[in-house]
Regions:
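Outer-membrane beta-barrel translocator/receptor signature
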Residues: 1-48, 54-60, 71-72
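Transmembrane beta-strands of outer-membrane beta-barrel pores
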Residues: 11-17, 28, 41-45, 78-86, ...
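Hydrophobic, lipid-facing positions within transmembrane beta-strands of outer-membrane proteins
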Residues: 18-22, 58-62, 104-110, 180-186, ...
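Residue-level signature of outer-membrane beta-barrel architecture
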Residues: 26-28, 66-70, 112-118, 186-192, ...
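Flexible loop and strand-edge segments within Gram-negative outer membrane beta-barrel domains
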Residues: 43-61, 65-126, 130-160, 171-179
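Outer-membrane beta-barrel transmembrane domain signature of Gram-negative proteins
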Residues: 157-262
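Structural signature of Gram-negative outer-membrane beta-barrels, strongest in the C-terminal barrel
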Residues: 236-349
Length: 349
């Protein structure tokens, strides 16, 4: 919540969840602005018979807002969640088995609105934000085999001698994701009124950068990874940038005792990813909507538009799959074996 508010404290306990939270809005007085703060602690248990599989989250937020000289409205804020779980001490788990999860999210945002209220402009607003999601999981898992198992981890096409997995061992799988996004926008708004017609014009430009700087998916000891497993580095993928321009006009016209609302808009987007075929991908999306409110209970509406959806990050960079074909195998000594595989990466068409 924004604005001046009293202290608000919440305590909640049930068999699965424990929660404590607080919030407060402070008026600094003498037109110095308002500060809002909040905090939260939550512990959620997945299984009542195993409290060690619980997730703990600590959330916080802080924000400042003020209007200078009645024409400049400024806001800035920071929010975050620090969470995770650790089942290492679970006595019900297999000896030595555990899972650790780190889930931290931070977001900073600011905005500046120029409340001009002129004949040619109503307001101009600038927004900017940064989003960071640090998510890391560590699974320490036991494996047991009755016979010797080959393990192919080749990441190039060709013939390779397969490695061998031990009969009994622990393997540590890591998934390290660090999503880091940036965004900024500038919006122009113009509100007008002509007799029985109300007009609202919006136009602006937006930019967003999306990427991941995490180490990705891998095993601490690559030789203990399961057969066919390959690591995947998230930071190896380039950033995806999106720039868009848009304009939208909304009209409200009183027709007798009824109200007719018309909206027309046009949006242009440009997607570019350095070093790829998507360095100059443009889309144009027009749309039109109409609504005729006959009375409180009856309305007629319709619309037309063309939407072109830009590919998401997971569509552009799917997991690389491989085909591993055993071409030779031999057994010798005390039931030991050797295998030769032909590995071939799949190619997207």
């Amino acid at each position: 919540k924004k604005g001046k508010t009293p202290w608000n404290v919440l305590l909640s306990i049930n068999p699965r969840t424990e929660q404590v939270s607080f919030s407060k809005g402070l008026d600094l007085g003498n037109d110095k602005g308002i500060v809002n703060i909040s905090g939260e602690w939550i512990k959620a248990t997945q299984k009542l018979n195993s409290p060690y599989t619980s997730y703990t989250r600590r959330g916080f937020s802080a924000g400042y807002s003020n209007t200078f000289r009645k024409v400049l409205r400024f806001d800035i804020g920071l929010t975050g969640n620090i969470g995770g779980m650790n089942t290492k001490d679970d006595p019900d788990a297999y000896t030595g088995e555990y899972t650790k999860v780190r889930d931290n999210v931070f977001r900073a945002n600011t905005s500046l609105a120029w409340l001009l209220n002129k004949s040619w402009i109503t307001n101009l607003k600038l927004d900017a934000s940064v989003y960071y999601n640090d998510n890391k999981s560590h699974a320490h898992t036991p494996y047991s085999y009755a016979s010797e198992q080959p393990a192919v981890h080749a990441e190039q096409e060709g013939y390779f001698i397969a490695g061998k997995l031990p009969y009994h061992f622990f393997a540590d799988q890591i998934v390290d994701s660090k999503e880091l996004d940036y965004a900024a926008s500038l919006k122009y708004e113009w509100n007008r009124r002509f007799k029985n017609v109300t007009s609202n014009l919006k136009a602006g430009v937006q930019w967003k950068g999306t990427g991941n700087v995490g180490d990705g998916e891998y095993y601490q000891n690559p030789s203990l990874a399961p057969n066919g497993y390959r690591p995947r580095s998230y930071s190896a993928y380039p950033y995806m940038h999106n720039v868009s321009l848009y304009a939208e006009e909304s009209l409200s016209v009183a027709v007798g005792s009824t109200m007719l609302r018309l909206m027309a808009g046009l949006r242009w987007e440009n997607l570019f990813i350095s070093g790829t075929q998507y360095d100059k991908l443009n889309t144009l999306s027009p749309r039109f909507n109409a609504r005729w409110q006959l009375n409180e209970n009856i309305a007629i509406r319709g619309g037309w538009g063309v939407t072109e959806k830009l590919p998401s990050y997971y569509v552009l960079y799917p997991r690389q799959e491989y085909r591993d074909i055993q071409t030779f195998g031999v057994s010798y000594n005390n039931n030991e074996s050797a295998y030769v595989y032909y590995s071939q990466p799949y190619t997207l068409l």
